[in-house]
């Protein structure tokens, strides 16, 4: 679960960066990264890669990297800024190091992609996958990003559809069909995009094979 970091940052420095990323304060984040980059005489990408909230869970630590927080909050601006720092320009990070940050698993085994998918933030999901997020990674509960987005979709349906049921019933059947065809929940949008993405294709195929195998096994 741990990610090998290029440098060692103080707990206070990491806390400041986490606060900036979580609160969505881009100016403060840029300022803190610049200061730390100067202090450690290294590229800002090293700072981003090294900023892991590694405090034990029982002491309030999450084990998350900076990408987790904007991904969870749907803050595309902060997330895209951090990804740009990691992946663009003379970062002096190799591909494996970038991948380690993008796919970093926190204390619960969740990556930034898991959090973005769970909270149905499609643009954040797209940005992370574009930066190399692995769609197939599962958390400690054995769940991948697609399943988490599906679960969010189920929760939305359970909470939001019941009050409207009576109204739907009095609508013409054709109108109901058109409305359903024209609308897609945020969770479903994330699921469909992940499964249709190049990296999600293999995941969908594997899921289909597993379902078929399970069905075959139940008939024997």
Functional labels for PLM-detected ranges:
Residues 17, 67, 113, 145-146:
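Conserved hydrophobic residue in the first alpha-helix
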């Amino acid at each position: 679960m741990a990610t090998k970091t290029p440098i060692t940052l103080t707990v206070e420095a990491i806390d400041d960066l986490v606060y900036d990323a979580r609160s969505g304060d881009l100016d403060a984040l840029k300022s803190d990264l610049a200061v730390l980059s100067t202090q450690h005489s290294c590229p800002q990408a090293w700072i981003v890669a090294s900023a892991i909230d590694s405090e034990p869970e029982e002491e309030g630590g999450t084990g998350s990297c900076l990408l987790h927080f904007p991904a969870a909050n749907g803050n595309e601006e902060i997330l895209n800024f951090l990804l740009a720092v990691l992946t663009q320009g003379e970062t002096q990070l190799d591909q494996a190091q970038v991948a380690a940050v993008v796919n970093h698993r926190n204390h619960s085994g969740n990556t930034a992609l898991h959090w973005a998918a769970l909270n149905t933030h499609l643009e954040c999901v797209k940005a992370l996958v574009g930066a190399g997020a692995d769609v197939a990674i599962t958390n400690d509960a054995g769940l991948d990003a697609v399943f988490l987005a599906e679960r969010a979709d189920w929760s939305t349906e359970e909470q939001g559809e019941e009050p409207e049921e009576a109204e739907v019933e009095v609508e013409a059947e054709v109108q109901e069909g058109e409305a359903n065809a024209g609308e897609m929940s945020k969770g479903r949008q994330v699921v469909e995009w992940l499964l249709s993405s190049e990296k999600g294709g293999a995941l969908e195929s594997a899921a289909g094979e597993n379902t078929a195998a399970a069905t075959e096994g139940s008939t024997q």
